[in-house]
Regions:
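Short alpha-helical interface patches
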Residues: 92-95, 144, 217
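Iron-sulfur-associated redox domains of electron-transfer enzymes in respiratory
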Residues: 1-131
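Local cysteine-cluster metal-coordination motifs and their immediate loop/turn environment
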Residues: 12-16, 46-47, 60, 65-69, ...
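Ferredoxin-like iron-sulfur electron-transfer modules
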Residues: 122-143, 154-180, 189-198
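Alpha-helix boundary/interfacial micro-motifs
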Residues: 30, 51, 75, 80-81, ...
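Helix N-cap / beta->alpha transition motif
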Residues: 39-41, 137, 211
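Flanking helices and flexible, charged tails adjoining ferredoxin-like Fe-S electron-transfer domains
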Residues: 1-5, 168-237
Length: 237
């Protein structure tokens, strides 16, 4: 499955849905199997900042959340990730099994696990201020522009009839409203708790078309009032 034996694991340090002990276990076992493993605190942040190492990350095996979310993340930077495993919903034995690696029966005494866990625990926890922004699944997006019309924070723009996430840092933390409005369910917030908004394929959250239309009309009224009042909701303004 993976040729260069390079692995990137996202610990999602500021959120609780990725089990940190599971991250340490998998990282330790892979290192003991001579994989070059890097554990990062927040893949979302690295993509948002277009970090210099993101190209190398994309070429590695990425162990993070839903594959659809990760692919859409990297597409924003014109990168393609070929190998992605879901640590958010898969157990450590399942992930190791996909790499043809035998799990360890004594999970508490895996060589190197304790030091990796300390490394993870030292990552900064940015509750309420961690990277939170939408990514677009271009396989689903119809470029209708509803998200751009709906958003009050200037996150989206349209260039050559293509919707883009232009100002991810402007997004309001923990607000997935635009994703709920998307008729094709193309907008993903990887850190949201329910599918399909978080990139999952299940329908854990559903809104009827009439509810979506009502929310859309109400938001357009708010945008109009905002413009008339000359009020900006953008951060740092």
């Amino acid at each position: 499955m993976i040729q260069n034996k390079k692995v990137t694991i996202c610990a999602c340090a500021s959120r609780s849905f990725v089990n940190k002990d599971k991250v340490a276990e998998i990282a330790a076992i892979l290192r003991n199997e001579e994989y070059a493993v890097t554990v990062i605190p927040d893949l979302c942040e690295k993509v948002m900042q277009a970090s210099p190492e993101i190209t190398e990350i994309a070429s590695s095996l990425i162990i993070a959340c839903y594959p659809r979310a990760i692919r859409s993340h990297l597409h924003r930077l014109n990168l393609v990730a070929e190998n992605i495993l879901d640590i958010r919903n898969s157990g450590s034995d399942e992930i190791l099994g996909q790499l043809q690696i035998k799990p360890c029966s004594d999970k508490e005494n895996i060589p190197g696990k304790e030091s990796i866990r300390k490394e993870i625990d030292a990552f900064p926890v940015e509750s309420g201020t961690d990277a939170w922004y939408p990514v677009i699944d271009k396989d689903r997006c119809t470029e209708c522009g509803r998200c751009r019309d709906f958003c009050l924070f200037g996150v989206y723009t349209s260039e050559n009839r293509q919707i883009k996430v232009a100002q991810p840092q402007n997004c309001k933390n923990n607000c997935p409203a635009c994703a709920r409005m998307c008729p094709s369910k193309a907008i993903i917030f990887p850190k949201y708790e329910k599918s399909p908004v978080n990139g999952g394929l299940d329908e854990e959250e559903h809104f009827a078309p009439e509810e979506m239309d009502a929310m859309y009309r109400e938001r357009l009224k708010m945008r109009l009032a905002q413009r008339k009042a000359g009020v900006s909701l953008l951060k740092n303004q």
